[in-house]
């Protein structure tokens, strides 16, 4: 009852040139109830502005893992859709603890440059292995001795970020990103952002924001007018 509650809003749900309707269902267990304190607003995290490409939104998911799921030409059209970032339990995939595979196809929305790039995946509950175009580029254990991972207890609290090997990202065609998630209990999934691609310079700024805290920085107001 005393926690700040923040929910990601898919951009596709916001009507920028029309009225929007917000409904909040509150369940009170005992004592006083209701929306008890603010701020109440639609906002954004500064770290999402650091992304060269935002990969949050609709992904595909299958609740197991096979190495062939990472193949570039693998057909995932029969997989379920899921919103990232959010736990899979919050989206109706209840009572599942174990391995799941996330897949995302994307074409870069930015131009190729000489600067190193990083794939940032926010927080994942609990462990992960990440493949880009069929190549393993990172896993949970890679984060343990980094500024993002060496101050917090529990894999689910570690912010993931993996350097993209030079020459692996395709700029004129689709890329296939696969994240294998192993949930050891309770909630699972890619549950907190940002999720996307950063330049090395922006990644340095991102690391500084979280060097001493795994909590998101202050939400900045966003005007819709």
Residue ranges and their predicted role:
Residues 93-97, 113-115:
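Surface beta-strand/loop "capping" patches
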Residues 5-7, 96-109, 157-163:
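Short beta-strands within extracellular/lumenal beta-sheet-rich domains
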Residues 3, 11, 15-93, 142-143, ...:
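An acidic-aromatic loop/edge-strand motif
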Residues 53, 100, 104, 117:
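A broad, low-specificity signal marking well-ordered, structured residues that form hydrophobic/aromatic
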Residues 10-15, 103-115, 122, 164-170:
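Extracellular and analogous surface-interaction loops
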Residues 20-26, 79, 106-137, 177-181:
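Aromatic-lined ligand-binding clefts that engage carbohydrates, nucleic acids, or primary amines
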Residues 8, 109, 135-145, 163:
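Short regulatory "switch" loops immediately downstream of catalytic or recognition motifs
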Residues 2, 99, 121-123, 155:
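Short solvent-exposed loop/turn micro-motifs enriched in small/polar/acidic residues
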């Amino acid at each position: 009852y005393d926690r700040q509650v923040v929910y990601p809003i898919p951009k596709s749900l916001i009507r920028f040139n029309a009225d929007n309707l917000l409904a909040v269902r509150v369940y009170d267990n005992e004592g006083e109830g209701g929306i008890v304190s603010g701020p109440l607003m639609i906002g954004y995290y500064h770290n999402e502005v650091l992304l060269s490409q935002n990969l949050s939104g609709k992904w595909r998911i299958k609740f197991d893992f096979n190495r062939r799921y990472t193949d570039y030409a693998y057909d995932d059209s029969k997989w379920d859709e899921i919103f990232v970032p959010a736990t899979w339990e919050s989206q109706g995939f209840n009572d599942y603890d174990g391995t799941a595979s996330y897949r995302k196809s994307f074409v870069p929305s930015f131009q190729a440059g000489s600067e190193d790039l990083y794939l940032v995946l926010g927080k994942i509950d609990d462990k992960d292995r990440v493949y880009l175009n069929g190549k393993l580029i990172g896993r949970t254990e890679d984060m343990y001795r980094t500024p993002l991972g060496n101050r917090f207890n529990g894999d689910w609290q570690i912010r993931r970020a993996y350097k993209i090997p030079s020459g692996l990202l395709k700029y004129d065609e689709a890329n296939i990103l696969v994240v294998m998630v192993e949930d050891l209990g309770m909630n699972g999934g890619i549950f907190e952002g940002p999720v996307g691609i950063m330049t090395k310079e922006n990644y340095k700024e991102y690391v500084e924001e979280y060097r001493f805290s795994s909590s998101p920085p202050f939400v900045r107001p966003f005007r819709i007018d």
